[in-house]
Structures are given as structure tokens and as C-alpha cells.
Amino acid sequence: WGLGFFRDCRFVERLINLDKAISCTYHGQDLRTRGVLKPLNDLSKLNITSELDLFSKHPNLDYMFLPYDTKQFSFDIKINDPIRICHAPTNRYYKGSETIIPICKRLAKEKEIEFILIENKSFNEAQEIKKSCDILIDQVHNRGGWGYGMNSVEALSMGLCCVTELIPEYIDFIPDNPFINVDSKSLFDVLSELVTNKEKIIEYKQKGYEWVEQYHNYNNTSNVLYKYYEDLGWL
């Protein structure tokens, strides 16, 4: 979060005096709303983020995909009957839920699918519900960061087909991404076509599971992190 134990960074300065290396990791809202703490920013030799939009807010960032244990779930490519679509907002405004929820409710009536809104549940409850679904709608509008985050990483690891809004910059950054790209205007039509094409859902389930394993598995992300350390002479 780009923070030490104290705002004046006295603890970090003590570590520097002990010849310790300092690295900062920015997760999104920290840099978007607060910015950097200058004393700590001056001392940090490595600044890492998994949020692509932060690159416009800091001149010295390195990227690392969100680390995750992608093997903790058993991958099941089967599709429910009826198809189950879920949306799991931690913050409705940031996820564009006011757009997503009415569209999914309409779809449930017209296409005979199930829509599950995952809110106000314990972590374990939310995970179990999400695992039982076929499609996750992550976000539209990109109000709280671009594209996708841990919500989608979890869902891809579970073998879900993931739908979200990716801006052109993100598509250029991850051109082999497994997401079905939508915006507020196209969401209903895209979902309407998707739920009538089970082969396409299966295709994206498989593609997503392979992609999240390649980029987000913690063994792969740790290799990226250690390469940054090696480049700085820390290993």
C-alpha cells in the first residue's frame, strides 16, 4: 500500500540504516486516492502494481499479475441447466452494478437463466456460490480500476466464463486475454447471445482456466518478482 508503520516513515528509515532493501506494492485505491508518501517513495527502489491504470499516476512502476493459488479448485467444464450467471460486487458503484443487475434480471425472465447476486456473505459462502455458477459478470464503467481484479481471478480459477469491460489500453496489454468484453450498451445483447451458445461458454471456460494458470499462478508470479529482485542485485 506504499505505507510504513508511521506516516513520517521513521521505521523505514531505520531499515535503510540497517542496509535493508525497500519495495512498495500499490493495489489501486491507495495511489488513486492518496498518492505516494514522498519520504517512502524516495526510499523505495522497487514499486510494483497489478493495476494497469496506476502507470499514469507514478513514473516508476513495474507490473506483476495478481498472485493466486489457481490450483485450489477442481476444474469442471460442465454447464448448469439452467445456466447460472453471478455478479459479486464489493462496491456496487465501482462495479457498475446499477447497470448489471437490471440487465441480468431481465435476462433471467426472457432467457430462463438464473441470476445470482452475491452480496453480504462470508468469504467461504461467496466462494461456494460462485463455484456453482457458469458465468461471472465482473464490472462495467471502469470506475474503480480497469478491467478485472481478484474477483475474476478467482472465477477463472474455478472454471467460470468471465464477462467484463476492457478498455483498448488493457486489450493491448493482455491481447490473449480470456474475457468476453462488454460495455453498458452491449451487455444485454452479448449475454443474450452467450446463453444460447453453450459451446462458446465452454470455450471461454477452458481458455480462462488455462490463461489464469499461465499468468496468475503464484509460482509464475514469484518468478517475475524474483527477476525484479535479481535485476536490482537483491538476490
Please describe what each predicted stretch is.
Residues 101-122:
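A conserved nucleotide-sugar
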Residues 23, 29-31, 42-76:
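Donor nucleotide-sugar binding/catalytic pocket of nucleotide-sugar-dependent glycosyltransferases
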Residues 139-149, 164-178:
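Nucleotide-sugar-dependent
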Residues 75-95, 101:
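Conserved donor-binding/catalytic core segment of Leloir-type glycosyltransferases
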Residues 155-164:
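Short hydrophobic beta-strand element within catalytic cores of glycosyltransferases
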Residues 199-230:
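A charged, aromatic-enriched C-terminal amphipathic alpha-helix characteristic of glycosyltransferases
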Residues 118-129, 143-148, 153:
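Conserved active-site histidine-acidic residue motif and adjacent donor-binding/catalytic loop
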